[in-house]
């Protein structure tokens, strides 16, 4: 019995509490750990025969009692547990498509749909037409069971796999289709060559040199494709051989990308996200920015009102340091007016300072001296003239002249051609003539043109739009409409007069309320100056709801401390 009890105890896991270690055992354990860390003693081995790293801390390597009470050295509790891992479908599984439903059963089965007899759904989910006598009672026309698709659980990569469920056999069908098309093209070409050979055209054409080039082009693959397209329509292709449309690329090939202007990696930085190159790419090459077609995008930062806004912001900071409460975003109007007045005063101060210095020391005659070119009668500026005196090259820019003749008056005209415009045509202003190179007719021509502008069609339209005779019914309906209009206009006049009276009464009430509010504010100001102990009490016997006019007067006279312009009300 004792041996059996010992064997049973060996098979069972020791669930006793851990005994307290002695000092000697604790010292030996620590020495063994140090030896293992130094590599002088073999490392611990888990149940799978793998070495346990001795440098792993104890709080990681020790096994909780509720996971493995055997206290064996292991790291299994730190590894992912297989029973808790989610299982995903293999790569070959996918939904079956095109499964044919065949009705094999001829008898009704228990638990099937009472309407059609299929086992995959119930009567309330049946999509067939409700039968007069269901399959449960008739036993005929048993519908086939729907194919139940497999439930696939895909992992992260499987859900995003674009080739998931792809069948390579589908591509083989396309290859077979193109092979059939190629075979048909070859047979057509062979038949056509046989017909030309039988008719004798091929021998005549072979003698000429032009036909040799045509045969070479004819044998090329591109010619075969064009020939096939002319005769057939490719299955699955939307191509019309009767109208061929060629779309040209409208991009200008002469333009240069920003990042290709200077290939030096130390030159201006190109931001590919915003497609911006702020600095000048030709800065290190020594070229003048004015002579270069592109000098960077930094010029946009200084365009518009950027410089004036920066000057205003600088003025606001300087004024704030000197005690003025101004802000560019909070008080833009006030800051702008203050800045303008500062500029005017600054200019006046400079002028006065200049005048006082000239009055004190003199020398105003030197400021009014003629230019240096007139004094020395020579300059270092290069100017090139033509034989006719026109400026070709130099400081003064030559005026561009038109290639057409200007201010040419011919055929007695006093105005040039194009000085008059009417109804989409150009003409002469002097005689209103629309014919170029015509002779001027003066005021007589203007009268003729003005008289000829009265069309005959207007008289015809007026004759056509003459009033037709009206019936008695139409006349009666028009009278009723006139009466209704008169009644409406009379009511509208009465309502307008009443509205004007109401507005006048409201204005009078508002004036009275404003005067009463002013008196109340004066009384409040007087009471606030009196000592608190001497102020009278407020009686609640006369409390009533204020009228609309009194509320409006209170709002108009109320002082708002948060109003930025409140400080200017007393000025």
From Swiss-Prot:
Disordered: annotated span: 1-91, 199-235, 462-571
GO biological process, one term: mRNA splicing, via spliceosome
InterPro entries: Slu7_dom, Splicing_factor_SLU7
GO cellular component, one term: spliceosomal complex
Biased composition (Acidic residues): 220-233
Biased composition (Basic and acidic residues): 16-37, 207-219, 514-523, 542-563
Zinc finger (CCHC-type): 111-128
Compositional bias (Basic residues): 482-492
Record's subunit section: Component of pre-catalytic, catalytic and post-catalytic spliceosomes. Associates with the spliceosome prior to recognition of the 3'-splice site for step II, probably during catalysis of step I.
PANTHER family: PRE-MRNA-SPLICING FACTOR SLU7 (PTHR12942:SF2), STEP II SPLICING FACTOR SLU7 (PTHR12942)
Protein name: Pre-mRNA-splicing factor SLU7
High-level lineage: Eukaryota, Metazoa, Chordata, Craniata, Vertebrata
């Amino acid at each position: 019995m004792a041996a059996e009890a010992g064997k049973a105890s060996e098979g069972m896991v020791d669930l006793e509490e851990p005994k307290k270690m002695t000092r000697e055992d604790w010292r030996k354990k620590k020495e063994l750990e140090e030896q293992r860390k130094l590599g002088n003693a073999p490392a611990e081995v888990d149940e799978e025969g793998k070495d346990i790293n001795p440098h792993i801390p104890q709080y990681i390597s020790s096994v909780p009692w509720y996971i493995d009470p055997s206290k064996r050295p292991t790291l299994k509790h730190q590894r992912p547990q297989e029973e808790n891992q989610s299982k995903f479908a293999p790569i070959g599984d996918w939904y079956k498509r095109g499964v044919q439903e065949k009705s094999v059963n001829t008898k009704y089965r228990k638990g099937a749909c009472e309407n059609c007899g299929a086992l995959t759904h119930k009567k309330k989910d049946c999509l067939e037409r409700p039968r007069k006598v269901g399959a449960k009672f008739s036993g005929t026309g048993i519908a086939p069971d729907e194919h139940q698709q497999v439930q696939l659980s895909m992992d992260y990569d499987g859900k995003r796999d674009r080739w998931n469920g792809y069948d390579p056999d589908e591509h083989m069908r396309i290859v077979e289709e193109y092979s059939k098309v190629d075979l048909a093209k070859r047979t057509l070409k062979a038949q056509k060559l046989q017909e030309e050979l039988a008719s004798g055209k091929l021998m005549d054409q072979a003698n000429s040199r032009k036909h040799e080039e045509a045969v070479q082009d004819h044998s090329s693959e591109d010619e075969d494709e064009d020939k096939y397209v002319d005769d057939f329509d490719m299955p699955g292709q939307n191509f019309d051989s009767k109208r061929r449309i060629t779309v040209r690329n409208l991009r200008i090939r002469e333009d240069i990308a920003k990042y290709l202007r200077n290939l030096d990696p130390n030159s201006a930085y190109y931001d590919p996200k915003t497609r911006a190159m702020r600095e000048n790419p030709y800065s290190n090459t020594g070229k003048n920015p004015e002579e270069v077609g592109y000098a960077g995008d930094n010029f946009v930062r200084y365009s518009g009102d950027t410089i004036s806004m920066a000057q205003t912001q600088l003025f606001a900071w300087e004024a704030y340091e000197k005690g003025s409460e101004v802000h560019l975003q909070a008080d833009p109007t006030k800051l702008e007016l203050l800045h303008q007045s500062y500029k005017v005063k600054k200019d006046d101060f400079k002028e006065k300072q200049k005048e006082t210095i000239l009055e004190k020391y003199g020398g105003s005659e030197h400021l009014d001296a003629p230019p240096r070119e007139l004094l020395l009668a020579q300059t270092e500026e290069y100017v090139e003239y033509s034989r006719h005196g026109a400026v070709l090259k130099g400081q003064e820019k030559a005026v561009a002249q038109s290639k057409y003749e200007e201010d040419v008056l011919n055929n007695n005209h006093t105005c040039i051609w194009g000085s008059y415009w009417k109804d989409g045509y150009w003409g002469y202003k002097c005689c209103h003539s629309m014919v170029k190179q015509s002779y001027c007719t003066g005021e007589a021509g203007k009268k003729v043109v003005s008289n000829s502008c009265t069309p005959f069609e207007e008289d015809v339209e007026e004759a056509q739009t003459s009033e037709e005779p009206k019936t008695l019914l139409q006349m009666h309906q028009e009278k009723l409409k006139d009466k209704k209009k008169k009644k409406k206009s009379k009511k509208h006049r009465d309502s307008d007069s009443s509205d004007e009276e109401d507005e006048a009464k409201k204005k009078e009430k508002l004036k009275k309320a404003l005067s009463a509010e002013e008196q109340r504010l004066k009384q409040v100001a007087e009471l606030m100056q009196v000592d608190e102990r001497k102020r009278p009490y407020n009686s609640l016997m006369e409390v009533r709801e204020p009228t609309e006019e009194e509320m409006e007067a209170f709002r108009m006279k109320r002082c708002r401390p948060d109003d930025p312009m409140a400080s200017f009300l007393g000025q």
